[in-house]
Swiss-Prot record:
Keyword Ribonucleoprotein: no
A Pfam family assignment: Amidase
Subunit structure comment from the entry: Heterotrimer of A, B and C subunits.
Gene3D superfamilies named among the record's database cross-references: Amidase signature (AS) domain
Protein name: Glutamyl-tRNA(Gln) amidotransferase subunit A
UniProt lineage: Bacteria, Pseudomonadati, Pseudomonadota, Alphaproteobacteria, Hyphomicrobiales
Catalytic reaction list: L-glutamyl-tRNA(Gln) + L-glutamine + ATP + H2O = L-glutaminyl-tRNA(Gln) + L-glutamate + ADP + phosphate + H(+)
InterPro entries: Amidase, Amidase_CS, Amidase_dom, AS_sf, GatA
Alphabetical keyword list: ATP-binding, Ligase, Nucleotide-binding, Protein biosynthesis
Catalytic residues (positions): 78, 158, 182
Family, as annotated: Belongs to the amidase family. GatA subfamily.
PANTHER family: GLUTAMYL-TRNA(GLN) AMIDOTRANSFERASE SUBUNIT A (PTHR11895:SF151), TRANSAMIDASE (PTHR11895)
Length: 493
């Protein structure tokens, strides 16, 4: 029999409904797995008491025939989401000891639907990073390893804890956020599925902000179906978030069986970047073949402003971050380092509380917003953002239903491999994903194969605004063709 923590979310839902096991049993199985996997450092804090109490409520609901959509399903929460009464840090020392008195909209909707909270998941500090190496609470280690090697690998970032926990069976699914690829890149690195919904599909209320015009919540899970189930509960209008869109939430799970017959899938020629590894190119071609064989038409398209996306993103995102992070001053919550006066306290607190990468991005953002540089950098980057959005609009107006690209330019790299490199080398991990955020579109990463060293590789599908259903249908087609990617033996247990 499959261990309870190794079930997919859909299988666990069906098993609980059939009373094959209890919510308490599956919660305990995951808590035991978390205890055995401390070496991965996927969780900043586990919440066993809360999990078991929530599971008991779920068992009572199931016994009465009152089960809700996610009844009794154990989930992990990225530590960027405010959770009432539970330590919430954004992976930063500056929020040490912070326990919110409120719950994020996304997590509250998961609890409304009966899900069980296992704990808070590790991440790059303030979601700034592509490797989960910048967390003040230690690096998260990927459960994957290269064949014949014990060298630790990164799980990707910033949602590295979410991706590692899902891949290692430490939760059935997890919340995550995506500002420039922080759901899709770690999902690709860990053989999991991650969707960044359309900007405005999920409320940002109660999520610690990085770059407000780019941030969007979404799920990471082990299958396309599991992601669809979770997004159905996470999405929805919230009047407390002015960017939240007031429109019905579709039945995402039903969409996975639609297939792709009659769809036109675009292949953007600009994504064939110089130096792309041959195995990434082969996988991309294979993905197009799978979709063609399932009845889709494959069409080469042009997204001419793609080359400007990454530099524009690394102007817009730090600019917004420098503004958002100005609120952390040691006065009302979190870390406080005394100074000779109030200005000294601000300076000392921020110097001690923020890590190196966060400081770098605050400084970049402050620079591009400063007098004399605002027009030259920030305004120009926003104009490029508009051009990128228009490129996608033109492709969709010409009849393209979704766009297929690689999710990442490589498989997972080793812990510390990029630590001393030029920061731009790390930023290049987002080369295939940032355009989606800049244009506010939905994008999904789905596992599609392994590289020569046995590490997962993912493909990305990009959709029309608020057409996540087509992405789920196409992603399910790829998942069916590629097969589920199984994690090798648990070396950490």
């Amino acid at each position: 029999m499959t261990a309870l923590n190794e079930l997919t979310l859909a299988e666990a839902r069906d098993g609980l409904k059939a009373k094959d096991f209890s919510a308490r049993e599956i919660a305990q199985a995951h808590l035991d797995a978390i205890d055995r996997a401390k070496a991965l450092n996927a969780y900043i804090v586990a919440t066993p008491d809360r999990a078991l109490k929530m599971a008991e409520v779920s068992d009572q609901k199931i016994a009465k025939g009152e089960a809700r959509p996610l009844e009794g399903l154990p989930l992990g929460i990225k530590d960027l989401f405010a959770t009432q009464g539970v330590h919430t840090t954004a992976g930063s020392k500056i929020l040490e000891g912070f326990e919110p008195h409120y719950e994020s909209n996304v997590s509250s909707q998961l609890w409304r639907d009966g899900a069980v909270m296992l704990g808070k998941l590790n991440l790059d500090e303030f979601a700034m990073g592509s490797s989960n190496e910048t967390s003040a609470y230690g690096k998260t280690i990927s459960p994957w390893r290269r064949q014949g090697s014990d060298a630790p690998l990164v799980p990707g970032g910033s949602s590295g804890g979410s991706a590692a926990a899902v891949a290692a069976h430490l939760c059935l699914g997890a919340t995550a956020t995506d500002t420039g690829g922080s759901i899709r890149q770690p999902a690709a690195f860990t053989g999991t599925v991650g969707i960044k919904p359309t900007y405005g599909r999920c409320s940002r209320w109660g999520i610690i902000a990085y770059a407000s015009s780019l941030d969007q919540a979404g799920p990471i899970a082990r299958t396309v179906q599991d992601c669809a189930i979770l997004l159905g509960s996470m999405a929805g209008h919230d009047p407390r978030d002015t960017t939240s869109v007031d429109m019905p939430v579709p039945d995402f799970e039903a969409a996975i069986s639609r297939g792709v017959k009659g769809l036109t899938i675009g292949i953007p020629k600009e994504y064939r970047v110089e130096g792309m590894p041959a195995e990434i190119q082969r996988l991309w071609d294979q993905g197009a073949d799978w979709l063609r064989e399932a009845g889709a038409t494959i069409k080469e398209i042009s997204l001419p402003h793609t080359q400007y996306a990454l530099p524009a993103y690394y102007i817009v995102a730090p600019a917004e971050a420098s503004s958002n992070l100005a609120r952390y001053d040691g006065v009302r919550y979190g870390l406080r380092v005394p100074g000779k006066d109030i200005a000294g306290m601000y300076e000392n607190t921020r110097a001690a509380g923020f890590g190196r990468e966060v400081k770098r991005r605050i400084m970049i953002g402050t620079y591009v917003l400063s007098a004399g540089y605002y027009d030259a950098y920030y305004v120009r980057a926003q104009k490029i953002r508009t051009l990128i959005k228009r490129d996608f609009e033109a492709a969709y107006a010409a009849g393209v239903d979704a766009i297929l690209t690689p999710a990442t330019p490589s498989a997972a790299f080793g812990i510390g491999e990029m630590a001393s490199a030029d920061p731009v080398e790390m930023y290049l991990n987002d080369v295939f994903t940032v355009t989606v955020n800049m244009a506010g579109l939905p994008g999904i990463s789905v596992p599609a194969g392994l590289d020569a060293q046995g590490l997962p590789l993912g493909l990305q599908l990009i959709g029309r605004p608020f057409d996540e259903e087509t992405l789920f249908a196409a992603a399910q087609t790829i998942e069916n063709a590629a097969g589920r990617i199984s994690l090798p033996k648990a070396w950490w247990a």
